[in-house]
């Protein structure tokens, strides 16, 4: 009978599971210890690096870093120690030991010394000198970009084609802004520009030549032209207003009033033209040929009778073209000052011309006042009629409109009885009374 391997029955044999478990546990403890040692070595290395960084920071800033527990041992001593290397004398040390001097005073003095040293260190660096500031400005990238943009813009503005395009764009913008204006605004703008040009030209002539009868007559003609243009503008405005009111409401009474007003306006223009023609004919009746005070050669004579001719010429040019024209063969009037032959005829003709102007102005003022009064009366009557029509429309709307229906509905609801109201809640009789 075979006995097998007897060594397998020994307690020290490595094949036994008990021995293998003991070896595994020992190896496990050894591995854990190695790991702990490696971790401790790593932590110490990190602490050493951190202390090195703190030391470099203290050297650069000059401020000593206080450890977490150093404040417990901070006390004055003759060797410095926790005071950052600051030493005190034996007398101060004796006073501290006897309780005559506090520790915080010595520590505060040390902190002041450290702060002063750091400020001196920063002042010695010269970080904000004029040269450094100029260098920073010179090396600024945003400033360099801005300078490049300004140089490019200046180069573009020096080119004639670019400047021509800019002027064209500006002109197009102004034209576009004028496109939105109405016809009346455009006429008013052109009239203002024309008046400004005339004033500048008048100032130029006044500064270069003395006043004369020609300029006085021209001023009177300008005054009458402005009055006529204002009258035409008023008639145009009234005509537009009449058209708008006619589109709003076509009433027979309103049409009749507008027709009467247009007839009165036509009569006023006819009377004004007749008055103007009579005043314009007065110099002709006084004497002179059809050339006025000018001869066939076109030169002015010395009797000052060309004023009447100019008045007739202007009276034929200003009104509508239904009047006769007297200047079809008259040469151009030259505003040259005439050589006076005698003083008495000049004064007489001047006084006659002034009387004519005064009479004409009085007639024009009377006609304008009459037209204004008639127009005011017509506008007041029209406003009163419109107010009456509006009141009538309001009454009709209140009588047959939604307000009356809603009022009738609530009044009927308040007059209903309890039984009828309950029936209506159930859906009966909803269309009987409404």
From Swiss-Prot:
Residues 20-61 form a coiled coil. Disulfide bonds: none annotated. It is found in: Nucleus. GO terms for biological process: mRNA splicing, via spliceosome. Residues 43-63, 156-412 are annotated as: Disordered. The keyword Coiled coil applies. GO terms for cellular component: Prp19 complex; U2-type spliceosomal complex. Keywords: Coiled coil, mRNA processing, mRNA splicing, Nucleus, Spliceosome. The keyword Nucleus applies. SMART domains: Cir_N. Pfam families: Cir_N, CWC25. Residues 359-381 have a biased composition (Low complexity). Residues 43-57, 171-198, 215-284, 297-319, 382-402 have a biased composition (Basic and acidic residues). Belongs to the CWC25 family. Involved in pre-mRNA splicing. Associated with the spliceosome. This is Pre-mRNA-splicing factor CWC25.
